[in-house]
């Protein structure tokens, strides 16, 4: 049965840092706990997986990460404050390029700035940078920079403010 971890259970996770008033489901999986920082007021829902045995994951204040999400911090993932990462979002800082005869690994940091909203089942690829107050539509695939206050959906970028 799903529930939020108690203060003692949060402390016993032995993350690099866990802030105050965080709500983390007991069904969240962590790999590389010593490389994961979660600031105050953040909520992470059921069946989310955070992998940082190589690299790191930093999550800002008052951010929500919906259930069934996956964050892979091989080269680093930085998520700002007051973000909403919807259910099923995948964030990768490592990927593979099979377009040539030889497999080439792509390792690039992902930066998600403050007050960003990412819709359900979106995929954020290595090297992506999403600036403040931007929105990513559900099912979108981001592989580049989304400038401040823009909406990216259906492979289009639109200024929203």
Model regions and ranges:
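Short helix N-cap motif at coil->helix boundaries in the Bergerat
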Residues: 144
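Extended, small-residue-rich solenoid/repeat segments and analogous flexible loops
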Residues: 1-37, 41
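Flexible, glycine/small-residue-enriched loop-and-beta-strand segment within the central core
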Residues: 5, 31-38, 43-129, 155-161
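Conserved beta-strand positions that form and line the central face of beta-propeller blades
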Residues: 27-29, 49, 141, 151
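Short alpha-helix at the nucleotide-sugar/activated-sugar donor binding site of glycosyltransferases
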Residues: 84, 134-135
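Acidic, glycine-centered active-site loop in nucleotide-sugar glycosyltransferases
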Residues: 148, 153-156
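Conserved catalytic segment of ABC-fold P-loop ATPases
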Residues: 131-134, 147-149
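A generic "structured core" feature
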Residues: 135-141
